[in-house]
Amino acid sequence: MNILAIGAHPDDIELGCGGLLLKASRQDHHNIFMYNLTRGGASGDPEERTKELIRSAKFIGAKSLWIDNFQDTKLSLSSDLINHIEFFIKKSDPDIVFTHSIGDTHHDHRAIAGATIEAGRYVPNILAYEIPVTRDFKPQVYYDISDVIDGKIELINIFWSQRGKSFLKSNAIRGLAQYRALQSRFNHTITGVEAFEVQKLFFGKEFKLLKFPQEKISNSMFEEMPNEIIESKST
């Protein structure tokens, strides 16, 4: 499977789906591609941030990292932005694309989200990730990262130049993952989750979904059931 992760700034991809990418890269049949549109010059030295981004891609085990030269904080939904994203979509031939949420508060993120939807019109699956400061986010997909949450924190720590930002601290990363795990109500053994919004989701023939066995119903519950249950069966 080819996976393309798109981000506006160094550390966006890692915050949004770093755990998923770490797990995917450990499996031989997954190819990770990363496309970053700016070098983050509005929040630090762009050369230093570029070096951090390269170290991050190596840590993840990405097959390719592409770094563009759009100006930080100046992105807008335009044909130029759409064309650039479409070029790297065609270059990576992804089965799934991860990008920013259309409801994000940062205008760079919103521009990329909209451009990805247009550029990815022939991509079967597009999911939008969140970062700890994303607000209007309504997840429908949850991915278990319990076994790599420490690795994700180590990944985020690569961005040393941004260490002063509270949402990059380990308690913010772990706290969001724990909150999404509780929200998903999967299973008490799952302690860390990355959540995603669905922009496009195409199921193939296998239609494999994660399932946990339901808890057994106690006998006392049956005392509260009605005396007669009529079950309708189609003929």
Task: Give the label of every model feature segment.
Residues 36, 66-69, 128, 142-144, ...:
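Structural signal for conserved beta-strand scaffold positions within catalytic alpha/beta enzyme cores
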Residues 19-20, 52-55, 80-84, 111, ...:
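Alpha-helical elements of Rossmann-like donor-binding domains used by nucleotide-donor carbohydrate transfer enzymes
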